[in-house]
C-alpha cells in the first residue's frame, strides 16, 4: 500500500531489539491511523512492553495492532486492561496447533471491512456478510479440523502454563548466552534480558563461517535443526549489521533439554575449530 501511494509508512526500529517508547511517540502524527507492533521479535526474542505502548497509541487517536506470532502461548496478554484494537497470531507456533490456523481479535473500536464474501452457515437471506462477529470476517467453510487441533494445543499450553513454558526455553537459552559471553568469536544479536525474552536467540557468527554453512553442518553432522539467514525480517538485520548473510537462530521448545543444548554447543565448538 505504501508502494502504491495509498498510505504513508514509518518504521521505528532499534538495534538492541527493544523499541524506545519515545521513538514511537515521535513517529506518530495527527494523521496516524494505525500503529502495528510485533510483541516478540522472531529474530531476537525480545519482548516489547505493549502495556505501556497501547495507552500512548490510544491517546493519540490511532488504532493499535499487535502481532503476537511469537508471544501467544508463552506471554500473558490481557485484552481487558490493555487497549489493543487488533491482535493477530498463528496457531502453529507456541500454541502447538496445526499449520494453517490462527486468530484475529478485533476490538470494539475497530471497523474492518469484510475481506471476502461467502456462505457462513447462517443468515443466508442476507446478500452480504452478517454484521455479527466473527461471521462478518469468516465467509466460507471453516477449517474445522484445524480449529480442533488448535483447541487441543491451547489446552495443552493452559495445563502447563505459558510462563512455565517460556521460563524453560529461556533457561536453556541462558546456557547458550553464558557460553557466548566466554567466547571471543561469537556474539548474541541484540540485547539479552531473560525476563523480557521468549525462546528465540540469534547468534552473530564468526566471519569465516557463513550462517547457512553452519546450519547445514549442524544438520548433516549433528542432526541439529536451526534457522539461518534473514528470518523473513531483512530490516532488523540491516539495523544489526548482519545483512545480507543474517544470523544463526536457536529456538528451543518445551521438549528440548539441557543435554540438547550441550550437544549444540559442542557442535559449534567442533565446527568452528575446524574439526569438520
Question: For each predicted feature, which ranges?
Answer:
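Pyridoxal 5′-phosphate
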Residues: 1-276
